[in-house]
Amino acid sequence: MPDTRDLFSEATERAELGRLDEALALFQALLKTDSNNATIWNNLGIILFRQGKYRDAVNAFGQATDTDPEFTNAWYNKSLALIHLGKETEALRALDKAIKLNPRDAEAQSQRALIVRKMAQVSDTGKTDSHSAQSQLRV
């Protein structure tokens, strides 16, 4: 049986090749032996997000932030998944955590401003675009 580092590398490689189902299975296998690893949870969330499974992605990013409350990228990624679920208020809370941890994060600041602007438009027009996340997920 390969060691954890080898399995992690294999999972990451499969994800980069777009073999998401294989990457997902490998990250899930890793969690069976190391369920308190925030990096694995974050990577699992990225795979789920890329598969369009936003609710599951939010849960995985939440596990990452529960395991490591200072994992800025997991907070940021969670916000993007929440946006896709139309949960802008929760997305703002996650972004605020990321920004508090890294106040110089221009991308998080920009994403926050975009959400606030979209929320203002919704209050003006009554319409929403739940797929407004313009940023890339972070490993």
List PLM regions with ranges.
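Mid-chain, well-packed structural core segment of small domains
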Residues: 68-84
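Structural signature of tandem alpha-helical TPR/SEL1-like repeats
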Residues: 3-5, 10, 16-29, 50-63, ...
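Short, charge-rich amphipathic alpha-helical segments embedded
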Residues: 29-47
